[in-house]
Amino acid sequence: MLLHDLAEQKLIHPPKWLPDNLAYLAIVGSESYGANLPGTSDQDLQGFCVPPKSDVFPHLRGEIPGFGRQHQRFGDWQEHHIKQGGKEYDFAVYSIVKFFHLAMENNPNVLDIICVPENCIKHMNKVGQLVRDNRRAFFHAGCFHKFRGYASAQMAAIERGANRANTKRAASIEAHGYDTKFLMHVMRLALECEQILLTGDLDLKRDSQFLLSVRRGDMTLEEGKAWWASKARDLETAYTNCKAVPLEPDEDAIKGLLMQALEMHYGDLSEAVRLETPVEKILADIDVILSKYRV
C-alpha cells in the first residue's frame, strides 16, 4: 500500500498506527472530476482512518472531558508535496469521527471523497466500503448553503485576481485574464449541488467534458459570470422544491452508521458505549410524564 511504502522510505510521517488502520483513500480533485490536464503529475489523495479506541472514547483511558489533563485527540493528518517516482502527492486523512461530522455538514470536499469513480479508489477496506455504500445517508438540502457558499467565494477570488502570484496558475491567468481552474471549481460546485438536490446522489464525472472545456479556457470570464448568475437562480429553485433529499441531516441515522463502522473495526463496543434500548427510552419517557404529577 502506498502509505506503507512512503512511510518505510521516511517520505511521510503519519502517526505509527495510521497506515494499518486506514479505511479509505481516494484520488480527489481534477482527476476524479475528469478535468485534469495532460502532463499533470500532482495527485491529491484523501480519505479517513479509524484511530485507537481510546482516542474515540477517551473515557476508556480514564479521561473526563473538561477536567484535568486532556490528551489531544487525532483529527486529521496532512502532508504535502511528497515526491516519489515522478509523482507529487498531497495527503489528507481524517479521523472517521471528524469525517462523519464534516460529511453530515455537507462539506463539499469531504462528500467528494466518498463519491469518486471506482477507478480513483486507492484503498478501501470493509469499513470504507460500508461508508461509501451508504454515502447517500449524508446528503440533505443544506448542501445548497455549503456548496453555494464555496462557489461564491471562488467567484469572488476570481474577480479580485487571486492567484496571480502562483507560478502554476500564472500562465493560465496571462492567457485568459483569469484563473480558469477557479472558474471550473465554481461550476463544478454548482453542478454537484444541483445533482444532489435533484437526484439525491452525486456522480463526479457526469459533467467532466464541460468542466474540462472551462479549465482549458474555452469560456470568457464574462460568460462564466453569466453562467454562474443563471445557475445560482436554478439552485434557488431546486432548493425550494427539493424532494430528493431531506431538508436537514438525519443525525441519529448517521450516528448509527458511525457506530456500525466503529463496531466493524473494533468489535464489541459494549464496554465503551451504552446505547439506550427502545424499551428503556419508553420507560424513561413515562417517568418524565409521571414526575410532572408527583407531589
Regions from the PLM with identified roles:
Residues L11-L60:
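Active-site nucleotide-donor binding segment shared across nucleotidyl transfer reactions
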Residues P52, N106, I196:
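Phosphate/oxyanion-binding loops and surfaces in catalytic or ligand/nucleic-acid-binding neighborhoods
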Residues P52, L60-H71:
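Short, His- and charge-rich active-site/binding loops that engage polyanionic ligands
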Residues Q43-G47, I64-G68, I121:
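Short, low-complexity, polar/charged sequence segments that are solvent-exposed and flexible
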Residues Q9, A137, F144, R148-G161, ...:
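Structured mid-to-C-terminal alpha-helical surface segments
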Residues M1-L11, W17, R294-V295:
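N-terminal regions immediately upstream of nucleotidyltransferase
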Residues D55-H59, D112, Q195-D203:
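Short, solvent-exposed secondary-structure capping/transition elements
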Residues R69-C193, L204, S208, L212:
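Conserved NTP/Mg2+-binding pocket subregion across the NTase superfamily
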